Amino acid sequence: MTRVKRGYVARKRRKNIFTLTSGFQGAHSKLFRTANQQGMRALASSYRDRNRRKRDLRRLWITRINAAARNNGISYNKLIQNLYQNQILLNRKMLAQIALLDTNCFSTIMKKINE
């Protein structure tokens, strides 16, 4: 059987890892073993946090809507319930943006709901 030296393949594999970890500090970007571990950890963290971001943003939207609704004298629960009963199709992201940027429009929505 012929001998295979793997020079190019191994170099290419290491180069890919080092490009992934190029901005990391110290040995995490210089030594292959630690760079490999940190690269895998970074990818796992980014996967986890992409899903966590969705959760966190939804919580933020609900908090903002609740604050704006309480300024208008109604709780968040009642607001969402009245939105569904009146068949107003505004999701939480849109409501939070309206509450934050255009309070007059949000007040108009509240009046429409309370009729």
UniProtKB/Swiss-Prot annotation:
InterPro entries, per the entry: Ribosomal_bL20, RIBOSOMAL_L20_CS, Ribosomal_protein_bL20_C
The keyword RNA-binding is annotated on this UniProt entry: yes
GO CC annotations, alphabetized: chloroplast; ribonucleoprotein complex; ribosome
Keywords for the protein's UniProt record, in alphabetical order: Chloroplast, Plastid, Ribonucleoprotein, Ribosomal protein, RNA-binding, rRNA-binding
Subcellular location: Plastid, Chloroplast
GO biological process: ribosomal large subunit assembly; translation
Record GO terms (molecular function): rRNA binding; structural constituent of ribosome
Pfam families for the chain: Ribosomal_L20
Lineage: superkingdom: Eukaryota
Family according to the record: Belongs to the bacterial ribosomal protein bL20 family.
NCBIfam families named among the record's database cross-references: rplT_bact
UniProt xrefs under HAMAP family: Ribosomal_bL20
Function: Binds directly to 23S ribosomal RNA and is necessary for the in vitro assembly process of the 50S ribosomal subunit. It is not involved in the protein synthesizing functions of that subunit.
Record protein name field: Large ribosomal subunit protein bL20c
Taxonomic lineage: Eukaryota, Viridiplantae, Streptophyta, Embryophyta, Bryophyta
Gene name per UniProt: rpl20
